[in-house]
Amino acid sequence: MQVNDLGFIATILFVLVPTVFLLILYIQTNKTAS
């Protein structure tokens, strides 16, 4: 299966960005709650 670099980077960003966003949101709520 041939995957071009742009598609590979786009896939990584598509997964990574929401994960980091949720992680920051989770940490912020934990700091506020405690």
From Swiss-Prot:
Signal sequence residues: none
The keyword NADP belongs to this UniProt entry's keyword annotation: no
GO-annotated biological processes: photosynthesis, light reaction
Keywords: Membrane, Photosynthesis, Photosystem II, Reaction center, Thylakoid, Transmembrane, Transmembrane helix
Location (main, coarse): membrane
Tree of life domain: Bacteria
Topology in membrane: Single-pass membrane protein
Subcellular location: Cellular thylakoid membrane
Any one cellular-component term (Gene Ontology): photosystem II
Transmembrane segments: 7-27
NCBIfam families: PS_II_psbM
Family: Belongs to the PsbM family.
Function: One of the components of the core complex of photosystem II (PSII). PSII is a light-driven water:plastoquinone oxidoreductase that uses light energy to abstract electrons from H(2)O, generating O(2) and a proton gradient subsequently used for ATP formation. It consists of a core antenna complex that captures photons, and an electron transfer chain that converts photonic excitation into a charge separation. This subunit is found at the monomer-monomer interface.
Quaternary context: PSII is composed of 1 copy each of membrane proteins PsbA, PsbB, PsbC, PsbD, PsbE, PsbF, PsbH, PsbI, PsbJ, PsbK, PsbL, PsbM, PsbT, PsbX, PsbY, PsbZ, Psb30/Ycf12, peripheral proteins PsbO, CyanoQ (PsbQ), PsbU, PsbV and a large number of cofactors. It forms dimeric complexes.
Protein name: Photosystem II reaction center protein M
Organism in which the protein naturally occurs: Picosynechococcus sp. (strain ATCC 27264 / PCC 7002 / PR-6)
